[in-house]
Structures are given as C-alpha cells and as structure tokens.
C-alpha cells in the first residue's frame, strides 16, 4: 500500500508518519529527513540541497525524484508512507509515471488541514534531538527535562528553517506549489481530508479509521 501525507509545514506529517511506522510497520519516507541527513554528512547532494532548505525553498525536482526512484527500485513492494513528497504537480506526475512502470499506484492521500496560527506556533515551538531525531514541542510536547532529549539526554536544537523569517517563506511556497496537489488528488478520487487540529493521538485515530 502506498500512502501520501500532504499538508502545510508543521501540520504533523512527520509525527503521524512515525506513528504509522511504529504502530503499523509502514516504511516512513520523509524527503525532509533524508535531505537533512545529507546536509549533515556534507555530501554533494546535501551541499546543493542546503542552499534551498535554509531559505525555505523547494530543492530541485530532479534531485528529489532520483532519491525516490532509488528507494522504490530497491524495494518496490513494501507498504510505504511518503511524508513531504510529492510537493508539487511536477513531482506528482513523475511519481505516477514511476509507479506505473512498477505496476503500482498511490492508494490514499491524507491532506492535513490546519490553520496558519496553529502552524506557526507548532513550528516555532518545535525542538529536535540531533542524535536520535526525536521531535518535541515547547508548547505541546515538552521533554521531561526542559532542554534535553528523553531518549539520550542530548541537548535539543531548533531547525534552521523553523526561524520566523524562513517559516514565512515555507508557508508561501506551500500555498503556491503544494496546495494545488489537493485538487490534483481530489480529481483522482484519492484525497482524504484529516483535520490536523487535535492531539497526536486523536489525529492518529482519525487516520487509522480512514485506512
Ligand atoms: P520537510 O522536513 O518536509 O518540512 P515540512 O513539510 O515543512 O514539514 P515539517 O517537518 O516542518 O512539519 P510536519 O508536517 O512534518 O510536522 P511535525 O510532525 O514535525 O522539508 C524541509 C525542507 O526540505 C523543505 O523546505 C524543502 O527545502 C526540502 N524538501 C523536503 N521535501 C521536498 C520535496 N519533496 N521537494 C523539494 N524540496 C523538499 O510537527 C511539527 C511540530 O508540531 C512538532 O514540534 C510536533 O511535536 C508538533 N505536533 C505534531 N502534531 C501535533 C499535534 N497533533 N498537536 C500538537 N503538536 C503537534
Ligand atoms: Zn535523542
């Protein structure tokens, strides 16, 4: 089964993707996490991607599509949840072509609907563990010790693109480039709207009931 999580930055795609992985054994493919790993390795892809990511812009489609193609070619028949991909109509069309050649298709697209003021609060409050990747929020999901990761006591950091100036850009890019995918998948009868404004557990229950 192939699922896509679609929604504005901070709407909970990463959080729900991680739950689909831990609770239902989906392969969680987050293009954002993959790119951040390349950036911290300072690989050629990471160095290129960093220029775009720090400004809140999309990384060029050809780099992203090649990454996804590698994953699917290696293991085409797993249950996947894609988080943060596709991100524009061009990526969605390339994804469809790629899946067609493997006799696969996107089964369901979950659109996480959330108001801008909540988005901004979630993004500005997000803190992440640079060691294990765990995500926290100073407003909604505090670690036990204010500034340290619950798993390994590493000091938590703020993502560079969660700074206020970059958040504004990310929201603009989302509205211009990603939002049109809602109509794209609605037209294909694959779109399921999820109100993302509950607790993590509430949103996950809603998701499961729609699977
Ligand atoms: P990416 O990492 O994909 O960022 P994003 O889409 O902006 O999404 P986020 O990770 O910010 O938010 P999320 O929806 O996953 O929310 P989360 O669960 O973390 O992309 C980063 C960059 O990489 C892009 O700007 C671009 O440059 C590049 N990129 C990535 N994919 C690309 C692609 N396909 N094409 C081109 N470029 C690409 O939650 C956010 C916060 O809220 C957390 O603190 C969390 O604890 C909290 N939270 C979550 N759920 C709840 C809840 N129910 N209640 C209260 N708090 C909650
Ligand atoms: Zn940690």
From Swiss-Prot:
Keyword annotations from UniProtKB, A to Z: ATP-binding, Cytoplasm, Kinase, Metal-binding, Nucleotide biosynthesis, Nucleotide-binding, Transferase, Zinc
Region (LID): 125-162
Amino acids binding Zn(2+): 129, 132, 149, 152
A GO MF term: zinc ion binding
Gene3D superfamilies linked: P-loop containing nucleotide triphosphate hydrolases
Gene Ontology BP terms: AMP salvage
Pfam families in the cross-refs: ADK, ADK_lid
A GO cellular component entry from the record: cytoplasm
EC number of this enzyme: 2.7.4.3
Annotated positions binding ATP: 10-15, 126, 135-136, 198
Reactions listed under catalytic activity: AMP + ATP = 2 ADP
Classification via HAMAP family: Adenylate_kinase_Adk (MF_00235)
Subunit structure: Monomer.
Comment text on domains: Consists of three domains, a large central CORE domain and two small peripheral domains, NMPbind and LID, which undergo movements during catalysis. The LID domain closes over the site of phosphoryl transfer upon ATP binding. Assembling and dissambling the active center during each catalytic cycle provides an effective means to prevent ATP hydrolysis. Some bacteria have evolved a zinc-coordinating structure that stabilizes the LID domain.
Stated family: Belongs to the adenylate kinase family.
Name this protein carries in UniProt: Adenylate kinase
Organism: Hydrogenobaculum sp. (strain Y04AAS1)
Lineage, top ranks: Bacteria, Pseudomonadati, Aquificota, Aquificia, Aquificales
Gene: adk
């Amino acid at each position: 089964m192939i699922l896509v999580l679609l929604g504005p930055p901070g709407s909970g795609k990463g959080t729900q993707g991680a739950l689909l992985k831990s609770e239902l054994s989906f392969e969680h493919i987050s293009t954002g996490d993959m790119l951040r790993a390349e950036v911290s390795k300072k690989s050629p892809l990471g160095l290129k991607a960093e220029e775009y990511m720090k400004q809140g812009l999309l990384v060029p489609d050809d780099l992203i599509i090649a990454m996804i193609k590698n994953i699917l070619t290696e293991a085409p028949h797993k249950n996947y949840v894609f988080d943060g991909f596709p991100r524009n109509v061009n990526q969605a069309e390339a994804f469809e072509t790629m899946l067609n050649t493997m006799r696969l298709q996107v089964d369901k697209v979950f659109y996480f609907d959330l108001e801008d003021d909540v988005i901004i609060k979630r993004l500005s409050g997000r803190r992440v563990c640079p060691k294990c990747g765990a995500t926290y929020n100073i407003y909604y999901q505090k670690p036990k010790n204010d500034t340290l990761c619950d798993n390994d006591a590493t000091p938590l950091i703020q993502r560079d693109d969660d700074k206020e100036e970059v958040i504004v850009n990310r929201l603009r890019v989302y509205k211009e480039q990603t939002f049109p995918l809602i109509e794209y998948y609605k037209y294909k009868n694959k779109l399921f709207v999820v109100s993302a404004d509950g607790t993590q557990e509430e949103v996950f229950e809603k998701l499961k009931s729609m699977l």
